[in-house]
Structure formats: structure tokens, C-alpha cells
Amino acid sequence: MKKRDIPPVVMMLSPMSAAMRQFVALIAAPIIITACKSATNPPDSPPGDTTVSITGRRMFPADNPWNKDISSEPVDPASDVLINTCGASAPLHPDFGTTWEGGPIGIPFVVVRGDQPRVPVTFDYDDESDPGPYPIPPGAPIEGGASSNGDRHVLVVDADNWKLYELFDAHPVSSGASWTAGSGAIFDLSSNSLRPAGWTSADAAGLPILPGLVRYDEVVEQKVIAHALRFTCPTTRRAYVAPARHFASSRTDAAQPPMGMRVRLKASVDLSSYPANVQVILRALKTYGMFLADNGSSFFLSGTHDMRWNDEELGAMKRLHGRDFEVVRMGTIVTQ
């Protein structure tokens, strides 16, 4: 779901289709180890399918849109219409966790050191992709697993140079000696720079993916999420609003939400009955909200795969619905 237009249909994605895995320890070489090793690793998971903490390091500067407190920002005049289009009665769905139907759920990422060897990457959309080589380690986890026919994202963080490398529809060639991908983007995590106007990334909206994921290390270890999150809607407009840089639709109806639309959980929602870990996520949704980043199922919230997640606990979020959210007032909507 990238550069090409999305036809006017409601796309119902299974929980497996939107996201996959996590972070790997900062050590001299990138290795993929599992946080909860067991004899029952999911199919297609890389050797040692990992989870780790990123030790609280914040992505992007404090004044970056991802890190902005929007709890007091005005509500957009079109909020009700836009929420209805996305699905006012749809439950908030955690599109991450442990496994579903035998496969891992959540978007994976891996951490490497600055001396990680770079490998060449060939892109389908090379005119809107940042050229390689990329520091992709052997055995880097792919969203959905090696045989996935989904979005197949690969996310790599160079922790020494504080850069993020992301691929969409990524396929290793010759055991990872090189890769092919639909598109790719490199983000300087110490900068506020955006993609060029009109450019995609590894995400439909031209946004980075990793900064918008719910991560186990934040929720359970740090007990705070200090940034916006990422979600999807079934249909979108041929338009985007900053910090998004790209649209992925042919629809021009103003009732359709533009990419980059930011929503927040209403301040009136009582969080006291939710599990403590879920409250961490919901407080972030009140304070920082979440960006519309791709076409997908209604109010699917993205996060990392981690075998330590409690899926039943995360499921408590489904008690919330689209109508519990409101659109934060948008700036200039770009349609060309």
C-alpha cells in the first residue's frame, strides 16, 4: 500500500497484515535473540526473534511533531465527519502482540552499530527512495516472516549514528548480500527534516514507521510513551497534511481523511478501569495522539511484536471506539 492509488474499497486487514517484531541489543555486532526463548518460535521467525529496550532514547528532537503535546490543541471543525469516515463504531484494535494464527503480530525492527556492513538495495520506486547501501544485518526480521505476502517492512536503527533505515516490500537476495524493495527511506533521528514534498517512504504517508510504534520497553519498562503513535483507516483522501508528505488514494471527497491526520483520545474518557499497561498507551493517545499513516482497517493501532506482551490485556483497548477520538485541528491540506 504505497505509491499506487488505493481503489475505493474498504480494506479489511487481518491482525497479521499490518505489523511485526522489534529491537535488538546494542552490542558489537547485531544479533537477534529472543526475549522469551521457547521451543515454539512462530513460523518464519528469524533465529532468536528478539525484544529489547532502547534505554529511553527519544527519537527526533523535543520540538518535533512526533514529540509534541497536542492535548490542548483545538479540535478540527471536520472532526465528526472524518471520524465517521474512518469508523466511529469501530473498536480501537491493537495490531501487535505475541502471535495470531501461528504467526507473529507487530512490526519488527533491529538495532545495529555504526560499523555494520552496508548492503545494496534495489527499489521499485527509486525516484522517491533514498539510495543505499543500507546497514541491514544478516537475518534481519521481516514483517510477517520470510514468506509473508504482506507489507514486509524491514526497520533498522544505526544506534551510533542515530539514523533509521526503513524498507517496504523488502526481499533478501543471496541470503541478504543485497535486497530488493518497493521503497526505502533514511531518517536522521536527531533532525526535524521531512521527506521531500510528495515523496513516499516505507509507509504510505511518507512518514517514518518506527517512531509511531507502541513498544514494550516504553509501556512496561519506562511506563511512559512520550510520542505520537501510528494508525490506519480503510479509505483516505488524495491529500496529506504535515508531517506526512504523500497520499495513497484517488479519492477527492473532503469527508475522507488525509494522510497525516492526527487524532487524540478524548480527555473525557475515564482510564481508571483499564489495566496499568494499557493506561500507559491510552495516556499517550490523550497527550500525543496518533497519525494516520496508511490505508488499512479502521483504527488499527501499530506496535512491535514481543512475546512478553499480554494479548488479553492489550485487548482491553477494544472497549474504545472511533467515537472516543477527535481530530486535532489540521494545518494546510496538500492535494497536489
What positions do the PLM features span?
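Bacterial N-terminal signal peptides that target proteins for export
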Residues: 2-24
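Sec-dependent N-terminal signal peptides
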Residues: 25-30
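C-terminal motif of bacterial Sec signal peptides marking the signal peptidase cleavage site
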Residues: 34-35
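Short, conserved catalytic or interaction motifs in soluble domains
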Residues: 38
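Short, surface-exposed polybasic-aromatic patches that bind anionic ligands, especially phosphate groups
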Residues: 45-336
